[in-house]
């Protein structure tokens, strides 16, 4: 094993970390915004609305993210005329847009199920108490249901965040030079895949470790009973959910 190559590759791959994090952040932000209405649609008593949301979630969860990314990036060219007419072709021809769209749609489907589970975990007694004090349905959701649902869903959502960060590596297949894409370029020049991918793996490992600690801290902060259990100080370690 070439230790010198490992040392030299580390700063080079670190230069691609901002690209990886930017892809993940934008995708997660868009995905979360989309996931909330999708989750509410899944819980709707209207069968048409619920079925539409279910169909979207089922299709996304049943197909590989790589296939979804390829369909958006390569498949959009089949509709170039239509996309040009509505002014979207300039976006769809950009790898960044296609990667973010694929990642956002993917995480939105998974996150909607996480949020749906969180909403369903809210006890009926809390909802009835909100009704008793005269809260409207919207106010109940904003002040009671949604905050509790987020606390309940946070551990699972933390896993989704880490999954999307790792999934940004697929963007390298459509010419985006993030950590994995840059690793491939270095490998093509050095013919040493093991050393380079060890460094890339270590970088992903560190990023996901930091995210898991941040999620743990957020979970501790949002749950008063957890703070009381550890005497008001943040826990030094916690299991990854």
UniProtKB/Swiss-Prot annotation:
Keywords: Cell inner membrane, Cell membrane, Membrane, Plasmid, Transmembrane, Transmembrane helix, Transport. This is Nopaline transport system permease protein NocM. Belongs to the binding-protein-dependent transport system permease family. HisMQ subfamily. Signal peptide: none annotated. The keyword 4Fe-4S does not apply. One of its GO terms (molecular function) is transmembrane transporter activity. Its main location: membrane. The chain crosses the membrane at residues 21-41, 52-72, 95-115, 161-181, 191-211.
